[in-house]
């Protein structure tokens, strides 16, 4: 698991799979996980397996499944994903946002959060994420979601 701090209360990276990785998140003061993976991404046990592992580690868990390598699904899911991230942060959590590799979906959600919720210029949000970790946040998905009327949340 590769985990990178973006803000003191916001981390991004790849999916935790092992008990030690959930414990590492706790040692980094993470109190909540936002997973963008689908059941197919997780494999055996699916999202519920991760939810159980997070709970066993004492971490809150939220899931907004986003299909990997699907810009349209990412664009449609961004408003819901960002709203869930914002909700967790406003509750005082330190949040770990992850997808499978931590390269596209999770950095895109974090960049959109920085831009939409914190007012960071999109280019600056992207530059900041690139400085934090090797990743490819999807600026086109963010720009498309901003003007879309997609408001229906995905069901976990």
Predicted regions, residues:
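A phosphate-binding catalytic loop at a beta-strand-loop-alpha-helix junction
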Residues: 92-111
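Cysteine-based protein phosphatase catalytic domain of the PTP/DSP
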Residues: 7-94, 115-145
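C-terminal domain-closing interface element
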Residues: 152-156
């Amino acid at each position: 698991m590769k985990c990178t701090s973006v803000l003191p209360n916001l981390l991004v990276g790849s999916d935790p799979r092992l008990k030690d990785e959930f414990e590492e998140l706790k040692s980094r003061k993470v109190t909540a996980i936002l997973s963008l993976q689908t059941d197919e991404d997780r494999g055996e046990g699916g999202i519920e397996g991760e939810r159980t592992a997070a709970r066993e580690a004492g971490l809150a868990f939220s899931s907004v499944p986003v299909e990997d390598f699907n810009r349209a699904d990412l664009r449609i899911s961004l408003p819901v994903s960002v709203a869930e991230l914002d909700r967790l942060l406003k509750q005082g959590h330190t949040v770990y946002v992850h997808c499978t590799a931590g390269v596209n979906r999770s950095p895109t959600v974090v960049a959109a959060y920085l831009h939409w919720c914190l007012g960071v210029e999109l280019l600056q949000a992207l530059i900041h994420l690139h400085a934090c970790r090797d990743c490819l946040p999807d600026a086109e998905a963010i720009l498309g979601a901003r003007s879309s009327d997609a408001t229906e949340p995905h069901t976990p």
